[in-house]
């Protein structure tokens, strides 16, 4: 891939990372930048997973590097601390694009070699006139729009809406996708193991995703050294790398947790073996195979699933049957494995997107040679993705980051409380040196020792009784009718979870408009708060407990 194209790709990705203003899931902050901020600046809240040792500090440590450098140089301004992780994420996305291009270029080379062989066979076996006809046909095909798998795959990657929408966020899933792509390109066993170990340290499920590739390396080793020696080399090398990677991760995690913990095992046991992640939402088994695959790959998924047909009908395409079927196999294996887990999110199968787009590019190149309709369909699909990037990246659910931008650009606030559902907004990493104390509705999970199930949290109380929660938390009173048995039960439930007067009145409060309407008379106006600004969150809301508008209220000082 030429350097000028890499530079343009990085600029494009950096533009998206710096300008996209919408939110998807709290993990984009609370499992990355907020943990990194806590490591470097010693301030902020750590989600409950870090109390149970379910996460390795490896990924946040990478994010913490630019924070540490800024602090060391004394350049840790509000804007710099916010912008630095976006540069890092743009680099990760660019490397994914480069990997997509390189894997597509490998297919180009195999196809070009096979087509030359077929052309030579044709010239030797056919008449001169027919040979001339074939040369004209090849020449025309090279002047087509989609004549290179590598460039077509890069175009699909750059224009894919979910790659732009999700890829700009500091998820472990995104860097996991990069490591998986790099692993797929390894022909030597040791680099393959090291990259697999690194990916598994960030997300332990990567080990399952990449496990089929071990058999490929096993086959190569037995072919080269014989079955016994080859198997011995594979197992011995694997054990050495496994001990080295796990040892390094354990030492790094010990420095953070202050105790020995095997985070990949704890994560796998909690989320997969015990399936406790189901308490965060459940979906049917076909969720990934059906709506998610179509949603994240977009309409180009039609070309992806057509790849086996092209391999079967096109003689020259059989030269790339192994890598294409391999990518389809890894994608299907990934979707199948994640489908066994009840808790499902679209970003969990992010790695499937680049594999699907490379396969779609292969089909596009082969079909566009003989069908103008395919070229027009591709243009229409790319246009659809561009529209989706705008809607999902700049319109839908943008309220929380607009609030953060307002705080970054405004005066210093001593105490800011976010009265909304669990982790609605990011923390100090988005408003460095602008807020002395950030408060929010606590949703830290505490597992019951007897049942092993999560206990009721403040967040659940807030969802059930938003007005009473605010009154009880700040003023130590509620409006339940204690003479009514059901109302009395609700009051007891609230009092058992939320401490009365557990938080002082903040200088500013952020909440949805619906919550503001409920507490405006009994709390906001009573304590001298006025509406500072209303932010458009989304033209429509699909998620529960969301609103079209988010409001910021400030306390008027006399």
UniProtKB/Swiss-Prot annotation:
Coiled coil: none
Recorded superkingdom: Eukaryota
Annotated compartments: Endoplasmic reticulum membrane
Pathway per the UniProt entry: Glycolipid biosynthesis; glycosylphosphatidylinositol-anchor biosynthesis
UniProt record, GO biological process: GPI anchor biosynthetic process
Topology in the lipid bilayer: Multi-pass membrane protein
Disulfide bonds: none
Regions crossing the membrane: 53-73, 81-101, 164-184, 190-210, 234-254, 292-312, 323-343, 348-368, 372-392
Broad class of enzyme this protein falls into: transferase
EC assignment: 2.4.1.-
Alphabetized GO MF terms: alpha-1,2-mannosyltransferase activity; mannosyltransferase activity
Pfam families in the record: Glyco_transf_22 (PF03901)
InterPro entries xref list: GPI_mannosylTrfase
Glycosylated residues (UniProt): 220, 275
Additional observations: The protozoan parasite evades the immune response of mammalian hosts and digestion in the gut of the insect vector by means of its coat proteins tethered to the cell surface via GPI-anchors. GPI10 is essential for growth of mammalian stage bloodstream form, while procyclic form (insect stage parasites) are viable but grow slower, suggesting that inhibition of GPI synthesis may be an effective chemotherapy against African trypanosomiasis.
Protein name per its UniProtKB record: GPI mannosyltransferase 3
Source organism per UniProt: Trypanosoma brucei brucei
Gene name for this UniProt entry: GPI10
